[in-house]
């Protein structure tokens, strides 16, 4: 969720994963690349919309580097740490909830692993995916240690919410740091369902 041009899906195939992949990317230019990447793979479906807690139309801020694009406004700490993350334009997008069409896309799936990288919007995605999260065995979420986007949930609060959903932390990967100070700003956290 927040697939960009399909980097994560490509990596899954490189390490030997042969199962279904379902990717969501709302930005048209990134979606075109994602669609091109996935079209030779019969087990990889792609959708051109965002996921959130409500079904709605909104605008997304497009960043110069594409990877930092977000529905939310960016904080100065982020921009100062990565000047190419600055917003250069806005694009109208559709937002749906994952639960609103989960039957359509993953009706008979087992061992569901959900990866969410939506630049501060991860909590909203989870709210709209409550039913599917209950079925999932794993979650991978980008989380900010310090505020990178307006009104986003930070790691310490997010961690508690994920634990209440019966998941436990398995791994953390540093994904974004201030290049001058080395201060860690964002991580990818991997959680698996408790037995």
Describe each model-derived feature in a short phrase.
Residues 1-195:
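Phosphate/nucleotide-binding beta-alpha loop and adjacent structural elements of enzyme active sites
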